[in-house]
Regions:
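Membrane-anchoring alpha-helices and their flanking helix-loop junctions
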Residues: 1-77, 105-139, 145-159
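Juxtamembrane inter-helical linkers in multi-pass membrane proteins
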Residues: 77-85
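Histidine-centered phosphotransfer motif of kinases
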Residues: 84-85, 89-98
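Hydrophobic, membrane-inserted alpha-helices
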Residues: 98-106
Length: 159
């Protein structure tokens, strides 16, 4: 499998933002910070619902592709090697951006300031996950070359 751990995330903050995203921590946090995203959303009309559901399915498809592309190198807190095939050949964090976009889209029909703040909190967690992962992986020369080739973290030509 060529699944060798090259290095481990060295910072408390890196561990914190990774672990808060998983049970039981995300459930505890989610019970105190409402975020409103859900799997069963209706977008005012059947046409609107269909269009948004197609967008959600496409984003989930890219998310799934990103997950499979990582294969045995998938790890939040260790460097097991750099994955450069699609969709990682387009952006450096395709799973994070797709997951966040799905959450924001499913929030649209029930948007409130409380849910917007909660979703903003979770989006920041994922931004900081990307930040700490990149800081850690940038110790690897192979990742430095990858960053020069794939310039965008989340959305090509934007972020």
């Amino acid at each position: 499998l060529k699944n060798v751990v090259k290095s481990v995330e060295p910072t408390f903050f890196g561990w914190f933002v990774a672990l808060i995203s998983y049970p039981p921590f995300n459930s505890i946090t989610g019970s105190r910070i409402p975020w409103g995203a859900n799997d069963h959303v209706f977008f005012w009309t059947s046409t609107g619902t269909t269009i948004f559901h197609i967008i959600i399915i496409l984003l989930l498809g890219v998310y799934l592709w990103a997950t499979f592309a990582l294969g045995p190198k998938a790890s939040n807190l260790t460097n097991r090697g750099i994955v450069t095939k699609f969709p990682y050949s387009i952006v450096r964090h395709p799973a994070y951006i797709c997951k966040n976009l799905v959450w924001w889209i499913t929030l649209i029909p029930v948007m409130s300031w409380q849910f917007a703040l909660g979703m903003g909190f979770w989006s920041m967690i994922y931004f900081f996950r990307a930040f700490t992962e990149e800081r850690h992986l940038s110790q690897d020369e192979e990742y430095k070359k990858y960053k020069k080739k794939v310039k965008w973290k989340f959305i090509p030509k934007l972020i």
